[in-house]
Regions:
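Feature for intrinsically disordered/low-complexity regulatory segments and propeptides
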Residues: 2-167, 171, 197, 360
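Intrinsically disordered/low-complexity terminal segments and short unstructured peptides
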Residues: 1-2, 279
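Intrinsic disorder/low-complexity polar-acidic segments
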Residues: 158-396
C-alpha cells in the first residue's frame, strides 16, 4: 500500500462550509438510496474479500453459441437451464444473465420472462442456433450450484471488480481513516458545518457491491483546503473526493470521477462541487489494458496531486474582473451563448447569494452553477455546468 500524507493541516472538528456555491451531484446519493444492507460494506478489506472470493469461484470461457442447449428444468416448468460443452451439470442463468442472453439473440427480455419456460427455451435455442457472431463468452460460478453470472459477445473485455477495489486500497488502505482517504463525514444542516468524524455504519458507508457491480466513494475531508474567502471574510473550504464503479458482468462501464467539494450530507449528496473530472472505460477488447495504463494511474495521480493548481485557479478567477457595469455583465454572458433570460437569472443569482452584482469570473461561475441547480432537466443542467467549468478554466 502507498501511504499518503497531506500538506494541509488536519481538521480537529467540524468546519464551516458554504454549499450555495458549486454544483450538487446526486450520483452517490442514488447509490446510497438503492443499496440494501447486504450490499453495504464497512471497510475496503471487507468489500475486497467479498468480490475477490466470488471471482475465485468463477471462470470465463468462449464457446460456440450453437453448442449451448436451453432446457426447461424438470422439477420447475418456470425455470430454464443451460447445458454447455464440458459441463456435466446444467447451469442456471441469473436474472441479469438471462436478460443478456435474450439481448444477444435479439429477443425482448421482458416478453421472454412472461412466456412459459418450455416456450422460452425453444425461442432462445432458435436464436442461439442462428446467432450471427457464432461465439459467446460466459462467466460461470460454482456457489453450491452452477450459475451463469454473465454472457457477452466474444470481444468483451472483463475488468474484475476486485481489481478496481485493489487499486483503490493501494492509496486508501481500509478506507476507514488509516490513510487520509476515508468514508466521508456528514454535513450538519443546523450549523452548516461538515463533520469529518462520523462512525462508519451501514447507514453512513459509501462502499457498495452487488452481484452485478461495485461502487465506492472516498474523500480526504480531514484536510480541508482554503481557496479564497467568502463575502463575510471566512475561508472558503473544500476537500478532495473521488468515486469509482465497475461491473465485471457487463451491467455498466468502469469509471472514476474526481473532484473538489465542500460537503457531503447524510443522504450522500455532494455539495459545492468544483473541478469534476471523469474517466470511463467500456468493456471492449482492450479494456483491461486501458484500466492498467489509464484509469489506475489517473486515480493514483489524483490522490498524490497537490491542490495548488486548483487553489491558484480559484484565486485567478476571483481576481479577474470582467464586468463593472450592467451592460458589461450582459455583454459578457451573451457573448458566451446565454440567452437574455438566462443572463438575467445568472445576475439575479449572484445578487441573491453575494449581495452584489457579478464582477469577477468566479462570480459569474457561481451564478451559472446556481442557475444549473434550479434545472430539473438533466441535459440543460449539464450544459450550464459545462459552460461554468469552461469559464473557470479560462481564468487560469
Amino acid at each position: 500500500m502507498t501511504t499518503l500524507t497531506s500538506n494541509n493541516p488536519s481538521a480537529r472538528s467540524a468546519f464551516k462550509v458554504d454549499i450555495t456555491r458549486g454544483e450538487r451531484i446526486g450520483r452517490v446519493s442514488s447509490e446510497w438510496f438503492s443499496r440494501p444492507d447486504d450490499e453495504r460494506f464497512l471497510s475496503l478489506s471487507d468489500l475486497y474479500d467479498t468480490v475477490r472470493s466470488r471471482a475465485e469461484r468463477a471462470h470465463a470461457r468462449t464457446i460456440e453459441s450453437a453448442a449451448i442447449r436451453v432446457e426447461a428444468t424438470r422439477d420447475n416448468a418456470e425455470r430454464l437451464e443451460l447445458v454447455v460443452p464440458g459441463e456435466r451439470q446444467a447451469i442456471a442463468p441469473t436474472h441479469w444473465s438471462y436478460g443478456q442472453l435474450c439481448s444477444l439473440v435479439g429477443a425482448p427480455a421482458t416478453y421472454m420472462r412472461q412466456l412459459p419456460a418450455p416456450l422460452a427455451a425453444i425461442n432462445l435455442q432458435h436464436g442461439l442456433l442462428n446467432h450471427r457472431a457464432e461465439l459467446v463468452k460466459t462467466l460461470e460460478m460454482d456457489d453450491g450450484r452452477l450459475e451463469l453470472r454473465a454472457v457477452t459477445g466474444p470481444e468483451y473485455g472483463r475488468i474484475w471488480d476486485h481489481e478496481l477495489v485493489s487499486s483503490v486500497m493501494k492509496i486508501a488502505g481500509n478506507g476507514t481513516g488509516d490513510t487520509m482517504w476515508k468514508v466521508p463525514g456528514v454535513l450538519d444542516w443546523a450549523t452548516m458545518t461538515h463533520n469529518p468524524f462520523v462512525d462508519i455504519t451501514k447507514d453512513t458507508t459509501t462502499l457498495y457491491a452487488s452481484d452485478r457491480d461495485v461502487f465506492l466513494f472516498l474523500v480526504d475531508d480531514t484536510h480541508p483546503i482554503e481557496a479564497g474567502r467568502l463575502p463575510n471574510g471566512e475561508p472558503d473550504l473544500y476537500f478532495r473526493g473521488f468515486y469509482a464503479w465497475n461491473s465485471e458482468v457487463g451491467s455498466k462501464t468502469l469509471g472514476i470521477a474526481s473532484f473538489y467539494l465542500r460537503a457531503v450530507c447524510a443522504n450522500r449528496n455532494l455539495w459545492g462541487t468544483e473541478n469534476f473530472e471523469e474517466i470511463t472505460i467500456r468493456h471492449s477488447k482492450f479494456a483491461a489494458q486501458r484500466f492498467a495504463h489509464e484509469a489506475a494511474p489517473a486515480l493514483t495521480s489524483f490522490a498524490n496531486s497537490s491542490p495548488a493548481p486548483f487553489i491558484a485557479g480559484i484565486k485567478a478567477a476571483r481576481e479577474r474582473i470582467v464586468a463593472r457595469k450592467d451592460d458589461d455583465r450582459e455583454t459578457f454572458l451573451r457573448r458566451r451563448g446565454f440567452s437574455k433570460g438566462e443572463t438575467g437569472k445568472v445576475i439575479e443569482m449572484v445578487l441573491s447569494e453575494e449581495g452584489r452584482p457579478p464582477e469577477s469570473i468566479f462570480d459569474f461561475v457561481q451564478g451559472i452553477t446556481a442557475l444549473a441547480r434550479t434545472k430539473t432537466n438533466q441535459d440543460t443542467r449539464l450544459e450550464l455546468e459545462g459552460k461554468a467549468k469552461k469559464l473557470l478554466e479560462s481564468a487560469s
